[in-house]
Amino acid sequence: MATYLVTGANRGIGLEYCKQLRERGDDVIATCRSSTQELDDLGVRVEVGIDITSGESVVNLKNKLSGLKIDVLIQNAGVLERNSLLELDPESIRRQFEINALSPLCFTRAMLNNLAEGSKVILMTSRMGSIKDNS
């Protein structure tokens, strides 16, 4: 049995990760800004109020998890503005970059003490990062 930490776990792919990991008997720590009934019903550890762009939020989680070994960190939290690249305003582009690229790296750095040798980090991405698919 392994311990997984999943960011952006309250819906979509993150929620499905939590479901499948729980079904096979793994320990799951689900993080999100706000939970859902479906996530709460899984019986996994849910840490709410976690905004990966907020240094304070990440430090609070780091302190809560002090001494806990994480075998796999699944960085799933992200946003997607459903506009074409030409329609995106600079603030929206900055926000997406911060949430989808910079914050997962900072979050991983904050969790380094929880990641032992052999632990794995999974960084989810989307087709939004593709120049070919978005031009």
Stretches found by the model and what they are:
Residues S84-I93, K120-S135:
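Catalytic loop of short-chain dehydrogenase/reductase
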Residues G43-E56:
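Rossmann-fold cofactor-recognition segment
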Residues V6-T7, Q75-N76, K120-S126:
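Structural signature of the Rossmann-like NAD(P)-dependent dehydrogenase/reductase core
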Residues N10, G14-Q20:
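N-terminal Rossmann NAD(P)H-binding glycine-rich loop of SDR-like oxidoreductase domains
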Residues F107-M111, L115:
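Hydrophobic positions on the long internal alpha-helix
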